[in-house]
Amino acid sequence: MIITTSRKPSQRTRSLVNDLARVFNFKILNRGKIPLSELIENKDDMIIVEELKGNPGRLKIFNFENNKILSMNLSLKLQREVSGKAFKNSGKLGSKFDKNTEHLKEFFFEYLFKKLSNYKEENFEVVITFKTVDESTFYIEVHKGSENMGPSLKIKTVKILDIE
């Protein structure tokens, strides 16, 4: 899976891309002047981190099998802000949903987890936790054991969009 940014990303956006690439073992594509239409034509599974007011503000996960996009508005804390260090996941990755985020499990499996070679249903070393803040907001955090390794994403909205 490829992760990239909108054009001319800020340092904070590039840091988020690097953090996500380390946790999920994504390949980073430095976009430069590549138009979005050209990225979509390749039909490679990808994630685009978009900016709002100079900070990472939206994450779009493309699913070309269904011609859909999982779009999330977010705020975040980077790895260096959460744990003070860069964490590289070299093991198996799993997920854990609380009762209020359980309804999102199939979306994240369909759009993200089933495309990861290191994702396992059990016997994993690193867990992606989904926990509720209130009825409209939840966190996605990366934990190794009981330690939060970062990044920590506060998801404000989740939408399913059509690829045009």
From Swiss-Prot:
Signal peptide bounds: none
Record-linked SUPFAM superfamilies: Class II aaRS ABD-related (SSF52954)
SMART domains on file: Brix
GO BP, sorted A to Z: rRNA processing
Keyword Transmembrane tagged: no
Keywords in alphabetical order: Ribosome biogenesis
InterPro entries: Brix, Brix_dom_Rbsml_bgen_prot
UniProt xrefs under PROSITE patterns: BRIX (PS50833)
Molecular-function GO terms, alphabetical: rRNA binding
Domain Brix span(s) in chain numbering: 1-164
Record function comment: Probably involved in the biogenesis of the ribosome.
HAMAP family assigned: BriX (MF_00699)
Protein name: Probable Brix domain-containing ribosomal biogenesis protein
